[in-house]
Curated annotation (Swiss-Prot):
NCBIfam families: rnpA (TIGR00188). The lineage of its organism: Bacteria, Bacillati, Bacillota, Bacilli, Lactobacillales. One of its GO terms (cellular component) is ribonuclease P complex. RNaseP catalyzes the removal of the 5'-leader sequence from pre-tRNA to produce the mature 5'-terminus. It can also cleave other RNA substrates such as 4.5S RNA. The protein component plays an auxiliary but essential role in vivo by binding to the 5'-leader sequence and broadening the substrate specificity of the ribozyme. The gene is rnpA. One of its GO terms (molecular function) is tRNA binding. Disulfide bonds: none annotated. It catalyses: Endonucleolytic cleavage of RNA, removing 5'-extranucleotides from tRNA precursor. Belongs to the RnpA family. It comes from the Bacteria. This is Ribonuclease P protein component.
Length: 118
């Protein structure tokens, strides 16, 4: 995913947190904020230190990024959102990660209504 699709600055993370629009499941928490003037979505990924060591945290981030890349055409475009991994996300398989992410994104109403898992 290109850098223009990422949220990196702490101030931008805080702005999304402060909207308090969140949904969660066992593996992920998603915070979202509408940005109507924005041409495409932006995402921030956070994996805390409760999830293993740096290798495990980066592994989880790669799984999240790949799942979002596959879901990109179906995601709502005028929004900033954060995906926060919970400790239960450690060791999750790619298919389970995508399934869990689809579930939480549907709860947050960030996926197109016509999306169905292949």
């Amino acid at each position: 995913m290109r850098k223009s699709y990422r949220i990196k600055k702490e101030a931008e993370f805080q702005q999304v947190f402060e909207t308090r629009n969140s949904v969660a499941n066992r593996q992920f928490v998603v915070y979202s904020m509408e940005k109507p003037q924005q041409p495409h979505f932006r995402v921030g990924i956070s994996v805390g230190k409760k999830i293993g060591n740096a290798v495990h945290r980066n592994w989880v981030k790669r799984r999240i990024r790949q799942s979002l890349l596959e879901l990109k055409p179906h995601l709502k475009q005028d929004v900033d959102f954060l995906v926060i991994a919970r400790p239960r996300a450690d060791g999750i398989s790619m298919t389970d990660a995508k399934r869990s992410l689809v579930h939480v994104l549907k709860l947050a109403k960030l996926l197109d209504s016509d999306y169905s898992e292949e």
